[in-house]
Amino acid sequence: MNKKLIILGKAPVQGKRGIDAKVDYPDCEVWTVGTHRIKNADRYYEFHGLKISPDGPVFRDVSNDVKAVSSLLPVNNSISAMLLEAYFEGYRDIELLGCPMIARDEYLKQKPALAMCIGFCLGNSRDSIQISWDGAPENVKYYEEYQK
């Protein structure tokens, strides 16, 4: 896919909670979960239940490719699942926004899992691939502070 993909988590992006995908990201495809106000997204994933009335297609499951690789990778959160889905569909310019994963369980388990999924995509792609994440760990040893 040549089009840039934005995967939106549930956290505010640049201080905004209410986002209109067609206005805020006009030249991009936008995927999100159906629990917060994102208007005009191209896909809504129902991993957390629907708390809004989506105005685009709703996906309730991931592809068999993602299911197969989840036996090798810790796909324990919706952002990881959507990232792998995008990778297997051929997206090569992906930006992860609104997913800092700073709550305790997210920080300890989901953030490292997403980092591993990003590494899988970057390491296994035969094509040029760009993945940016606004919540990426700044320190490789960030987990150690909870081991004391």
Stretches with model-predicted labels:
Residues 1-148:
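Metal-ion/cofactor- or nucleotide/acyl-coenzyme-handling active-site neighborhoods
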